[in-house]
């Protein structure tokens, strides 16, 4: 197998070990296992350019992204339809995708596992023209993420970031007032929390956000009940206990597609942990089996 690995050189693990050392280790492991590997260190827009180049190379069989969930998510627009398999080296903060597919968190073990992994058809979510592997959120959660990331960029710890996010929510946040349209569904909502996941979430550790499966061809839709600070606090406590499927503070359902018409023209949206403003209205779809994901045996 010919591997093109694109590594985010700003990822914490890479910075600690030294980027050239990481590249040399990965290349040596894959070569020793009989594969041809080209490892590229990049950051920012250069990562996108390197991924696009690898996806257009007819000799490449697999593209492996070393970074967090956001780096992986941004690669999807290049990988989907390219005929390449996609793998992940978990070098980010939460690493939800790596957890979901059983990729080891140790760098060397992850490289070995991916060398022998099986390309497995995997569903993708899509909101407008943006793919996602995990979830897309509107309401309080994107505002929490934005405040958290600002604190982290200023040198704060993970805990500092979380506290900054909670402080920001305590000062107030925008409600999502919207009309929902789906198969046999039409409703108006006013909520602090709105999430659409790639397949349904199961009750588990909240820091894993584990889905029941990744080939169920459905979107999971989760809407917080109520719109005030107390309802948001109740929801947060339930989620902190790992309750998604049994969370009484959530209305949940599964749909193949959903349209959302919000009063805000460009609300904040969190897509696989990355926050951006997106033009409303929103169209969510599930794309069954479009991504060949490298899944360890």
From Swiss-Prot:
EC number: 2.7.-.-
Cell compartment(s), UniProt: Cytoplasm
Boundaries of every DAGKc domain copy: 1-131
GO molecular function: ATP binding; kinase activity
Sequence similarity: Belongs to the diacylglycerol/lipid kinase family.
Gene Ontology biological process terms, A to Z: phospholipid biosynthetic process
Keyword Kinase applies: yes
Protein's UniProt keywords contain Nucleotide-binding: yes
Inducing stimuli: Part of the probable 18 gene mamAB operon.
Observed phenotype of the null mutant: No visible phenotype, magnetic response and magnetosome formation is wild-type. Deletion of genes mamH to mamV (amb0961 to amb0978) gives cells with no magnetosomes and no magnetic response.
UniProt keywords, alphabetically: ATP-binding, Cytoplasm, Kinase, Lipid biosynthesis, Lipid metabolism, Nucleotide-binding, Phospholipid biosynthesis, Phospholipid metabolism, Transferase
Top enzyme category: transferase
Record: residues binding ATP: 68-74
Any further remark recorded for this protein: This bacteria makes up to 20 cubo-octahedral magnetosomes of about 45 nm in diameter which contain membrane-bound crystals of magnetite (Fe(3)O(4)). Expression of just the minimal mamAB gene cluster (amb0961 to amb0978), including this gene, is sufficient to form a minimal magnetosome chain with small magnetite particles.
Record SUPFAM superfamilies: NAD kinase/diacylglycerol kinase-like
Catalytic center residues: 274 (proton acceptor)
Protein's recorded name: Putative lipid kinase MamU
Species: Paramagnetospirillum magneticum (strain ATCC 700264 / AMB-1) (Magnetospirillum magneticum)
Any one GO cellular component localisation term in the record: cytoplasm
Function: Might phosphorylate lipids.
